[in-house]
Amino acid sequence: MTITNDTINLVQSDLDNLPHFATEQNHTESNLYLNKNLVLKIFKNRNDIALMKNKEKKIDFLKTSNIEEFILPKHKIYIDNLFAGYSSNHFTDSKTLNNIYYLPLNKKIQILTTVSQNLESIHENCIILGDLNADNILYNNNIIKFADVDSANIGDLHCDNYSQALNNQNIDPFKINTVESDI
């Protein structure tokens, strides 16, 4: 494994030596690994050239952006010289929004108010989070961050999951999402 300011270069066997990063959600599009203070996200469907080009462009944009509400990509990851994912700083000691149920009511209100304000700020900048769910909203003290932001719709870089459905004229949101409770 070679790490520079902008990239991490791996060979496939390097992944065998990295611990999987345990999260509360099941990642269908990627595998997560932990390397010191970095979370490495390696996409599973790396043979889809168009998808990977779109993701790489999005990572390039996000790396140079200053969206404080996002856990931003730090490095692009290449495996055997092909774009394979990205790294981001580990948001140490954070919890997902799924853990909010155990907090006092005033803390819940504070966290959810901040989430709402952060979403408003993101939407004002014409960014739509493509994978917005409780597992991708992290908090630590009074800091709220959105994870898994490579699925966002940013300008002409569309949400990977929903862009085709959103191009239809008549959209029924219950047909876009597979779980009605996510809406």
Regions found by a protein language model. Name each.
Residues 1-21:
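Juxta-kinase regulatory segment immediately upstream of eukaryotic protein kinase catalytic domains
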Residues 39, 84, 143-144:
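Hydrophobic residues embedded in beta-strands of well-ordered beta-sheets
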Residues 19-76, 100-101:
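ATP-binding glycine-rich loop module of kinase domains
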Residues 107-121:
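Conserved alphaE helix
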